[in-house]
Regions:
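Polysaccharide-binding and catalytic clefts of secreted carbohydrate-active enzymes
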Residues: 1-129, 138
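Alpha-helical structural signal in soluble globular domains
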Residues: 16, 72-80, 123, 127, ...
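Core-facing hydrophobic residues within beta-strands of well-ordered domains
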Residues: 19, 130, 194, 238-241
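Hydrophobic faces of well-ordered beta-strands that scaffold small-molecule active sites
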Residues: 22-24, 86-88, 133-135, 166-170, ...
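Solvent-exposed loop/turn segments at secondary-structure junctions
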Residues: 28-30, 92-95, 138-142, 172-175, ...
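Alpha-helical scaffolding within the catalytic cores
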Residues: 108-125, 144-159, 180-185
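C-terminal structured "cap/appendage" subdomains that terminate the fold
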Residues: 172-195
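Pro/Thr/Ser/Gly-rich low-complexity, intrinsically disordered linker/stalk tracts
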Residues: 211-246
Length: 246
């Protein structure tokens, strides 16, 4: 019922308004709080155990609940306006290396999308259920638990596919406090799969926190540019632009 309601809301927004995209942030299952387990025993009994899941498979069941939501939202958009994009801005760590039997996780030590929020972002990218992915890499270069460079390298290598754009979510206040804007911008531009940045929160740019807006305008965004093309959403080139004046 919850998925159906959310999809009805998405369908209403997409059909009534000329929007570019439906965007979701990092809220799937709640962020865990010590001593406060998520109260879904009755739901798991009805929709999990009664459907063939084992007691030990509650995590898999939760992940599949979220997978179904993402898949159904994408399908809802495709049936309404297939050119409208669907994107996610997940928490910045997919899985820590120590949590993955094959060592495929990042060399980090923090909360995890897959294990703690039950958000299998890498699968959504692989399956083409989202059109863009903006992991929130809000830490500094050299952070002991979640190093910025380690994480953007991981996302650039492990969670990309043709047709799903990768952008880096930047924390403006923390970046400027650490005086790392230049290093971050130059490094992410060296990665082949990264299409750009999204800066959070926007008011830090408007307030020009520690000169961030000036630096972006003068050094990194000096010239107008088109956003990267989402060619997988359509197979026709737009018509030639006419009546332009130099």
């Amino acid at each position: 019922e919850s998925r159906q309601f959310i999809c009805r809301v998405v369908r209403d927004i997409v059909s009534r308004y000329d929007i570019d995209a439906i965007h979701m942030d990092d809220y799937f299952y709640p962020y865990p709080v010590a001593g406060m387990p998520f109260p879904d025993d009755k739901s798991f009994q009805k929709y999990g155990l009664n459907k063939g899941y084992k007691v030990s498979q509650r995590a898999e069941w939760r992940r599949e609940n979220v997978n179904k939501l993402i898949r159904e939202i994408k399908r809802t958009i495709l049936l309404s306006k297939p050119w409208v994009r669907f994107g996610i801005s997940p928490f910045g760590i997919y899985r820590n290396k120590k949590s993955t039997p094959d060592g495929s996780g990042s060399n980090t030590n923090g909360l995890q999308n897959y294990d703690d929020l039950y958000a299998d972002v890498a699968r959504w990218v692989k399956e083409g259920w989202i059109d863009y992915n903006i992991p929130q890499i809000y830490w500094e270069i050299g952070h002991p638990a979640a190093d910025y460079i380690t994480l953007i390298q991981w996302w650039n290598k492990n969670a990309t596919r043709e047709g799903t754009h990768l952008y880096i979510g930047q924390n403006v206040a923390r970046t400027m406090k650490a005086d790392q804007l230049t290093r971050k911008m130059l490094y992410e531009r060296s990665l082949s799969k990264v299409k750009g940045n999204c800066f959070w929160p926007a008011n830090e740019i408007l307030w020009n926190n520690k000169g961030v807006a000036d630096s972006l305008k003068q050094n990194y965004h000096r010239y107008p540019a088109l956003i990267p093309a989402y060619t997988h959403l359509h197979n026709r080139a737009p018509q030639e632009v006419k009546k332009l004046k130099a």
